[in-house]
Regions:
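N-terminal basic, low-complexity leaders that serve as flexible interaction/assembly modules and, when applicable
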Residues: 1-87, 91, 227-228, 327-344
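Active-site mouth loops of central-metabolism enzymes
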Residues: 42-57, 163-190, 286-296
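Active-site-proximal, glycine-rich beta->alpha crossover segments in alpha/beta enzymes
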Residues: 90-191
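Alpha-helix-loop-beta-strand connector modules within alpha/beta enzyme cores
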Residues: 120-137, 215-237, 274-278, 333-342
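Alpha/beta enzyme core
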Residues: 157-203, 215, 223, 227-235, ...
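Catalytic-face loop-and-helix region of soluble metabolic enzyme cores
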Residues: 231-344
Length: 344
């Protein structure tokens, strides 16, 4: 793997000193960026077609480079690996799964696949990003956690309007849920290791529904999948666990991830005292970046740095940029992060 010129993020990941806290944002390439919206409009295709097109995905992934972020995350969807498994979602605008998971037979019908054969576009995106960047910035890969994917597969669409139904299914159909999560765990390990082999300098696992998962379900189903995944990943690339607004820091610390990406419910100062060697990512409120004034954003960033002491810290949001976020607020976030993130 080539030498990275802007190595701040990689240095933090390897517990090395930096001149300032690195910054990037979840969903940094997307609907808050007018250039993305224009590109998507000009392209005219559905999202799944764009995700499968390495040339366009590379172009979109690189858009945030112009605002000064310290890492590029590939433009892709957490549902991508479900297509070769026989559970592909249609984006119309979607996502829609024709047959939501309801039976053990459906779980057993999921197809094992080789990412090198069936997800060549993902490898092409990661390799293409490294070729375009020429070592300028590190490239991040990612995957949805088994439970995040299970939420979509059980709901058959975006689960946000069906949370209670999905949780009821998990509690009532424990054997189906267990089998589904076991299959998804093995698939996710292969998928993330494939990304690492394709050039990802670090990978992030998205536990996207951690904020609505009851503690007992988290302990029974979520925690074991995280531990299995992180223990099976290639050690050449650090790993990040994102748990959306989960207060269960004790469980997160047992996951085996190199970095914990935490929400507003976690104060970084006591979190660092609890685990001094852990690297934390986050955790500026995305609603402040979306709806606040520039001064509000500045103060939120300063507060975050005061909590972390600018040590073992990657500045990010509590979760992804909201669609309504003004692009000038995104630019201000990065500018102020670089200004106040200096390590003295």
């Amino acid at each position: 793997m080539s030498v990275i010129k802007n190595e701040r993020l990689l240095r933090v990941l390897n517990h090395l000193p930096v001149d300032r806290v690195p910054v990037w944002m979840m969903r940094q390439a997307g609907r808050t960026d007018p250039e993305y919206n224009q590109l998507k409009k000009n392209d005219g295709r559905s999202l799944e077609k764009i995700f499968a097109d390495p040339e366009v995905s590379i172009k979109i992934s690189l858009l945030p480079k112009r605002i000064g972020v310290d890492a590029i995350i590939m433009f892709q969807d957490i549902l991508t690996p479900l297509t070769p498994a026989g559970a592909g979602f249609n984006f119309a605008p979607g996502p829609i799964l024709e047959r939501p998971i309801r039976s053990m037979a459906q779980v057993k019908a999921l197809r094992a696949f080789d990412p090198e054969v069936d997800l060549q576009s993902v490898s092409q995106i990661l390799k293409g990003l490294n070729a375009e960047l020429k070592g300028e910035l590190p490239v991040l890969g990612f995957a949805g956690s088994p439970m995040s994917l299970a939420f979509f597969m059980i709901a058959g669409r975006s689960p946000n309007q069906k949370i209670e139904e999905v949780l009821a299914f998990i509690e009532e159909q424990t054997e189906i849920t267990k089998a589904l999560l076991e299959w998804l765990t093995l698939m996710t390990v292969d998928y993330l290791n494939f990304q690492i082999a394709s050039g990802a300098h670090a990978v992030q696992l998205f536990e996207s529904f951690a904020d609505v998962i009851p503690l007992e379900i988290y302990k029974k189903f979520v925690q074991p999948t995280q531990e299995k995944i992180f223990s099976a990943l290639e050690t050449t690339s650090p790993s990040i666990l994102f748990t959306k607004e989960s207060p269960h820091l004790d469980l997160m610390l047992r996951s085996g991830a190199s970095v914990l990406s935490v929400g507003n419910c976690i104060n970084l100062k006591p979190a660092q005292k609890q685990a001094p060697e852990m690297i934390y990512q986050g955790n500026v409120d995305n609603k402040i970046v979306a709806d606040g004034t520039k001064e509000d954003i500045t103060q939120a960033i300063r507060k975050c740095f005061e909590q972390s002491g600018r040590k073992n810290h990657i500045l990010n949001l509590n979760h992804g940029l909201l669609e309504r976020t003004p692009f000038e607020n995104v630019q201000h976030f990065v500018k102020v992060a670089k200004e106040f993130g200096r390590v003295e």
